[in-house]
């Protein structure tokens, strides 16, 4: 194996930036203003401010970039610094750079539905160096209930008249098809589609982005990536912790809206889509939309819903169930686990079940895509062979591995399960991978929308799940209880077995490399 040359974080992201621009220069001479709407909130202090700091520290932001925080709270830059700096992971050697970063920060207090507040924000931005000509990037780190008022006021009072204007919208993008359509229609009446960046941070993860390269840059996968060879596809998202005092927010949306309708469905698209004409943003998103249009609405008999209960043998939080969270409404029937089977009704995937599983308080932290292949025809090993699987492990410990049969070492001629393994932490141990938010925010500065959700994608995603969500809200079925720290309801395993997935339980991938 060739030795990897150590690359700094700046070099890695710089290469990415060069790829995004396809050789064009990154316009360091332009003035940019990055406006964080909702600057006093958790998302801002834990994710957005740290991400902007990392990009600034590594020289990846345009040279003349200013950061403006906006929220209702009467704060100062010192307050913002106190809240967010613990998440920066800054070293003592970066002290001067940190001072330079906060010197570029400012803060404006104002209401979200008050025109005068936005006029004051605009005056503040115009007063910055070349601020009236600056490119403006608005990050809506806000609850969706204020999106309409905020976007309307931004459009009326805060748009740059010379530079470009871009807006980043955080999920949830509505609660169902109808509310999503209303929000999309409102935002699209104010901004062009090329100005709107609907962010799903999973699309910024290394292994999710690797799906396209894995599929379309390797000849070996093309002939087998179809219904003739693949028996089923399993997309999994597991968290080993519960709501831990944040159940009030979660209860409003539930696990399907929180994870399945966005993260897992986006990964499904990348697995199932046809080869795009190019890596141009719209070429890629066109193919994703085609996949979604081939998926029918979820059928109730292909759904299992669960809710975690305390583990009597556990410790600490593990002893508490979802309903023990004081922020959760008493008697809530909101699901913390869901397993859903979808079918892509086209020539490539006809009859192949796509199984989406996600949940809280499960036995491990894991997100992965697993393709299970059909049994080998003409078995000569007396049913000792297990199905081959290709696994793309998104988190933790990014990896691609193929589960396959090899001869068991020794005197006997017996097959046993093993794997061909590419663990990123070992093969690329000197490469510093950018955080998902770093990659995506850099994409917005560069104007690349490939890893953002287009309005027609969003509409099709909600079309698939809205009837099920409405049925759940109307009938309020009681979710199946499962123990904190388990694999989830056994009924989910039974559903997967019914549609064709074979779970042997005899093999578990173990990271073979000390990271």
UniProtKB/Swiss-Prot annotation:
Documented effect of changing residue 488 to V: In CNSHA1; Campinas; class I
What protein am I looking at?
A: Glucose-6-phosphate 1-dehydrogenase
Q: What phylogenetic lineage does the species belong to?
A: Eukaryota, Metazoa, Chordata, Craniata, Vertebrata
Residue numbers binding NADP(+) 2? 357, 366, 370, 393, 401-403, 421-423, 487, 503, 509
Q: Which disease is it linked to?
A: Anemia, congenital, non-spherocytic hemolytic, 1: An X-linked disease characterized by G6PD deficiency, acute hemolytic anemia, fatigue, back pain, and jaundice. In most patients, the disease is triggered by an exogenous agent, such as some drugs, food, or infection. Increased unconjugated bilirubin, lactate dehydrogenase, and reticulocytosis are markers of the disorder. Although G6PD deficiency can be life-threatening, most patients are asymptomatic throughout their life.
What InterPro entries does the record tag this protein with? G6P_DH, G6P_DH_AS, G6P_DH_C, G6P_DH_NAD-bd, NAD(P)-bd_dom_sf
Positions of D-glucose 6-phosphate binding: 171, 201-205, 239, 258, 360, 365, 395
Q: What is the effect of changing residue 212 to V?
A: In CNSHA1; Sibari; class III
Q: What residues sit in the active site?
A: 263 (proton acceptor)
PANTHER family, sorted: GLUCOSE-6-PHOSPHATE 1-DEHYDROGENASE (PTHR23429:SF0), GLUCOSE-6-PHOSPHATE 1-DEHYDROGENASE G6PD (PTHR23429)
- On this chain, the residues bearing Phosphotyrosine are 503
Effect seen on changing residue 68 to M: In CNSHA1; A(-) type I; class III; frequent in African population
Result of mutating residue 227 to Q? In Mexico City; class III
Q: What is the effect of changing residue 128 to P?
A: In CNSHA1; Vanua Lava; 4% activity
Q: Could you state one GO cellular component term attached to this entry?
A: cytosol
**Phosphothreonine PTM sites in chain numbering:** 10
Name the reported effect of residue 396 to L. In CNSHA1; Bari; class I
Reactions listed under catalytic activity: D-glucose 6-phosphate + NADP(+) = 6-phospho-D-glucono-1,5-lactone + NADPH + H(+)
Reported effect of changing residue 219 to G? In CNSHA1; Meyer; class I; likely pathogenic; disrupts dimer formation; reduces catalytic activity; decreases protein stability; no impact on glucose-6-phosphate binding affinity
Q: According to the lineage, what is the superkingdom? A: Eukaryota
* Keyword set includes Transferase: no
Gene3D superfamilies registered for this protein in UniProt = Dihydrodipicolinate Reductase, domain 2 (3.30.360.10), NAD(P)-binding Rossmann-like Domain (3.40.50.720)
Describe the effect of residue 403 to Q. Impairs dimerization and reduces catalytic activity in cells under oxidative stress
Q: Which SUPFAM superfamilies match?
A: Glyceraldehyde-3-phosphate dehydrogenase-like, C-terminal domain, NAD(P)-binding Rossmann-fold domains
């Amino acid at each position: 194996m060739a030795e990897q040359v150590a690359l700094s974080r700046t070099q890695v992201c710089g290469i990415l930036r060069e790829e995004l621009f396809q050789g064009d220069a990154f316009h360091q001479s332009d003035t940019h203003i990055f406006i964080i709407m909702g600057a006093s909130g958790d998302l801002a202090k834990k994710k957005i401010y740290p991400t902007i700091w990392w990009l600034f520290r590594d020289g990846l932001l345009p040279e003349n970039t200013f950061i403006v925080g906006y929220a209702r709270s009467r704060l100062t830059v010192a307050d913002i610094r106190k809240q967010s700096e613990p998440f920066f992971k800054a070293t003592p050697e970066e002290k001067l750079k940190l001072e330079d970063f906060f010197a570029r920060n400012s803060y404006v207090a104002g209401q979200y539905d008050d025109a005068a507040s936005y006029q004051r924000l605009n005056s503040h931005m115009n007063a910055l160096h070349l601020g009236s000509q600056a490119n403006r990037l608005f990050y809506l780190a806000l609850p969706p209930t204020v999106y309409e008022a905020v976007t309307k006021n931004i459009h009326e009072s805060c748009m740059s008249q010379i530079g470009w204007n871009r807006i980043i919208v955080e999920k949830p993008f509505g609660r169902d098809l109808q509310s999503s359509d209303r929000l999309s229609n409102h935002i699209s009446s104010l901004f062009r589609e090329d100005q709107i960046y609907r962010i799903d941070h999973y699309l910024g993860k290394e292994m999710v982005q690797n799906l396209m390269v894995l599929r379309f840059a390797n000849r070996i996968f093309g002939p087998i990536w179809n219904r003739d060879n693949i028996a089923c596809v399993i997309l999994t998202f597991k968290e080993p912790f519960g709501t831990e005092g944040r159940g009030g927010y979660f209860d409003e949306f539930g696990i399907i809206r929180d994870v399945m309708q966005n993260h897992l469905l986006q990964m499904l698209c990348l697995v199932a889509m046809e080869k795009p004409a190019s890596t141009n943003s719209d070429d890629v998103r066109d193919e994703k939309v085609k996949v979604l249009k081939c998926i029918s609405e979820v059928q109730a008999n292909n759904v299992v819903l669960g809710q975690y209960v305390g583990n009597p043998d556990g410790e600490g939080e593990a002893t508490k169930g979802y309903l023990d969270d004081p922020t959760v409404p008493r008697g809530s029937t909101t699901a913390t686990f869901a397993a859903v089977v979808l079918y892509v009704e086209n020539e490539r995937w006809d009859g192949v079940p796509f199984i989406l599983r996600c949940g809280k308080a499960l036995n491990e932290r894991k997100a992965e895509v697993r393709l299970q292949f059909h049994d080998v025809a003409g078995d000569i090993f007396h049913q000792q062979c297990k199905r081959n699987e290709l696994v793309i492990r998104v988190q933790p410990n990014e990896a691609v591995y193929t589960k396959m049969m090899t001869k068991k070492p020794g005197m006997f001629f017996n097959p046993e399960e093993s794997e061909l393994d590419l663990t990123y932490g070992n093969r690329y141990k000197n490469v510093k991978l950018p955080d998902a938010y770093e990659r995506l925010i850099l994409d917005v500065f560069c104007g690349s929308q490939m890893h953002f959700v287009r309005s027609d994608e969003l509409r099709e995603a909600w079309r698939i799940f809205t009837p099920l969500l409405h049925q759940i809200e109307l009938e309020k079925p009681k979710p199946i209880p499962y123990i904190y720290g388990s694999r989830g309801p056994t009924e989910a395993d039974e559903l997967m077995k019914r549609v064709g997935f074979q779970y042997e339980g005899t093999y578990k991938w173990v990271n073979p490399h000390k990271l």
